[in-house]
Amino acid sequence: MTPPPSALPPAARRALFIYNLFFPPVFLALLPGFLLRMLRRGGYREKFRQRLGRYTAAECARFAQGEWIWLHSISVGETLLALKIACEIRRLAPEKSIALSVTTSTGFAVAQPHAGDWLEVICNPLDAPWIVHRALDAVRPQRLIFIEAIWPNLLAAAKRRGLPATFLPRLSPRSEARFRRFRFFTAPIFRLLDALAAAEPEDTARWQSLGVEPARLRVTGNAKFDATASDGARTAEFRALLQSLGIPDDAPVLLGGSTFPGEECILAETFLTLRGKFPALFLIIAPRHVERAAAILSELSPLNLRIVRRSELTGSGSQLPDLLLLDTTGELRDWYALATVVFIGKSLTATGGQNPVEPVLAGRPVVFGPHMENFAAITARWLAADAAVQVRDAAELRTQLATLLADPARRATLAQRARAIAAEHTGATTRTAETLLFSR
């Protein structure tokens, strides 16, 4: 049964007027860069018509049957979290089906293998009023759930139709500053939400200061930090691939996870230095954006490293390499289990940091640079408990890695302490899914 239409509050209408006034010129200004990224990443033709709110007759027929929840994500990180939430929603409400929408081709590539009877993967529509209305007409969701980012027109269109809408955000210092700067716009949009799932108790005051009503805030814990078993079969497969390259099981492995420009060169140079003391050391680099693989190979060329790309790795054997470049998506979590020490990307040459909890949940010690703003709460607790290592620069990175590679007991202690702190978020996935699914 379709809910009755609802009028938007005047403040929300004013905010949307401003948004739609500036959206076209901003979109056109950003379009060349967006198209360039799409071309580099590939896969942009996949269901491109859905970005304009157009669906095939077969897709519309499928959405016309069953009870659909629209789960809205952006790229790889958000999509992995969305898949986790989707599975929990399905467990809580097995009669529901999920339409998982993504923006990037890499996010689509991660989500698509999970599509099935109850999960349909689609592309996010452009956030223009007529396009999102067309998309809602096709998908016919009973509820809209946003993961880490809100499409204002999509949210408004859902609320006009009387649909509940909930939000699982990430409140980094950068995003908080942006929300505060444009509070005149963001606060009325936030007030359209039926519920917001906050990761930490201290986040509630921050969200209230940004305009979210206290009654709509729920503290659920961080679902990203809630342990999910890695795929043991995939890890075994990856171990066999390393063995086929001549890498013995007891060889120390340094893994750089979700690295950003500049960090690959630092890791490679560090690796060459450490090899003098640890001759069996092997390096794995997983760039955050796999389309940078060719640029990384070019940058590392002067170092004369023997590099093999994951996309070209068949298990048939080749000359013993120095470095494995993970230029595939959706595999990193299962590679972490093979590492001896993990460096967290986007923390040395960029700001914000990438998710440090996945390697910790795999039982691996983590090292990161000075910039972990997006994960400030948990990394601060780790550092206070001597459960992780933070370095200031490349020189200190070399020193700390040398210490850890030489000290198995220290590595085990770090991993155990960090995992114990992360375990405090056990159950966060269920609490988050319940909030996002049932709040009205």
Regions found by a protein language model. Give the residues of each.
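Catalytic binding pocket for nucleotide-activated donors in carbohydrate/polymer assembly enzymes
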Residues: 193, 214, 337-421, 435
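Conserved sugar-transfer catalytic core signal across GT-A, GT-B, and GT-C glycosyltransferases
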Residues: 154, 263, 331, 354-355, ...
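Active-site and donor-binding regions of nucleotide-sugar-utilizing enzymes
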Residues: 8-11, 17, 31-227, 232, ...
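Conserved catalytic-core segment of nucleotide-activated headgroup transferases in glycan assembly
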Residues: 78-93, 235-313
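C-terminal alpha-helical cap of glycosyltransferases
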Residues: 425-440
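Structural alpha-helical scaffold elements that stabilize or flank donor/cofactor-binding regions
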Residues: 135-137, 189, 317, 335, ...
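Acidic donor-binding loop of glycosyltransferase active sites
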Residues: 139-143, 319-351
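Nucleotide-activated donor-binding/catalytic signature segment of Leloir-type glycosyltransferases, i.e.
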Residues: 111, 115-120, 297-326
